[in-house]
Amino acid sequence: MKSSLIAFFLILTSAASGQVRKYANSFLNIGVDARAFAMGQAVVAQVSDVSAAYWNPAGLARITSDWDAALMHAEYFASIAQYDYASVATQLEGKGVLAVTFLRFGVDDIPNTSELIDENGNVDYNRIQLFSAADQALLISYARSSASVEGLSYGGSAKLVYRYIGDFADAYGFGFDLGLQYQRGRWAVGAIMRDATSTFTAWSVESGAFDEVFLQTGNELPQNNVEWSLPRLIMGGSGIWELDERYSLRTSLDAEFTFDGRRNTLVSSDFGNVDPRFGAELGYKGFAFFRMGVGNINRTLDLNGDRSYSWQPNLGIGFRYQGIQLDYALTDIGDRSAALYSNLFSLRYNWSRQ
């Protein structure tokens, strides 16, 4: 007990010397799976496939096949940035479900013009070199069903983060997500605590690579530092109805609670913020699905200083056949929010041992 208290206070002390940033490791908040995007990312209570490793690791326990795998590729900012996701989950023979997930958000082939001018003052384009700036994460997740409470499952994800900007700087970090799900009949509720212990990211700057350039241009030299992502709580509920022999309807409502200062969310204060999301899915014979969702509701300030609200509507379709599922989402229909619209595709395949 005494050693635990010492460790706890050491963590608090080191956290105080770092920087708490609202948007540290923001690439981890983009999301995965076109189905979830189409439903406004309101999936915390109902996710039950390999993407649960990201959305709510407790949902992994509801996977019924021996193996489940998924891939997604997306492009942002006129294809300048690439976002890739891959995940695989497997049953542990009655001892739970294990999943491994890889995420990468990066910009490649960036020209480095810091050495464009040679020592004689001449422009030499042969001195331009290309580099990449990327954020990567590896998630190792585990979940299992409760032996004492029917319908309850729990799980967690350990997150290993590696970020780099060419040879100029890189960072390592780690953190944990913890999740719960409870299902009873047609209803389900869920919750996930992202960055439950605060996600720690330590930056190391190779300052020698550009000290001279920074000093000549009057810029401040970057320093090594530590970033902390504070915990955020996402809670949600979901229900499903069989309309007839052919059609089913699922609806979901999630709310994300953040405690890192005032944000431009629907409900905001200095203490905390609430960001709601809603999604619906109409299914046809378990084969075809039409989805819609609303999220990213923000208070915006226009050029006249007047406040208004923006929101992001999403649509999508999906098809499932013999273990193969292909999903598509079009986000930000009609450019209702400040974000640009995106076309997202994801592929999922599940199979069992013979």
What residues fall within each predicted segment?
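Sec-dependent signal peptide recognition
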Residues: M1-F8
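Hydrophobic h-region of N-terminal signal peptides that target proteins for export
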Residues: F9-S17
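Subset of outer-membrane beta-barrel
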Residues: Q19-Q354
